[in-house]
């Protein structure tokens, strides 16, 4: 399977849990899907496959920006990095969703955080964390 096809499949796989959290946050199907952790686990396995497949073959490193650039110059390494983003953004979004449900934070407050977490990862997390402190008066 080509990296392009795997990229499209991974992007499609990750949409279901995000849409469930955004559109039907209180539905049983959402609770089942998100609490199973199945989607991030499947993507993590895919990530692991590409890491094993490409490890040490790109000539790059994590010690300099130029080294990271060399790492990401290989399509399969870039694909692994993208899957890494998908897994961790989904993990953070699922935490936000669970925490909002547990603390009775309005879905209308949560929704922009989920969208930003999906699109810009840490920005959505930062917004959620700030709103959580504002509404609950506690960071954790």
Please describe what each predicted stretch is.
Residues 1-10:
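N-terminal membrane topogenic signal
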Residues 10-29:
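N-terminal signal-anchor/start-transfer transmembrane helix
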Residues 29-49:
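Loop-to-helix transition at the N-terminal end of transmembrane alpha-helices
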Residues 47-57, 124-129:
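C-terminal TM-helix exit segments that contain a strictly Trp-centered aromatic cap at the helix terminus
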Residues 54-77, 90-94, 98:
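Membrane-helix interface/capping segments
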Residues 80-87:
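Hydrophobic alpha-helical transmembrane segments of multi-pass membrane proteins
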Residues 95-107:
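Membrane-helix boundary connector in multi-pass membrane proteins
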Residues 111-133:
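Hydrophobic, aromatic-rich membrane-embedded alpha-helical segments
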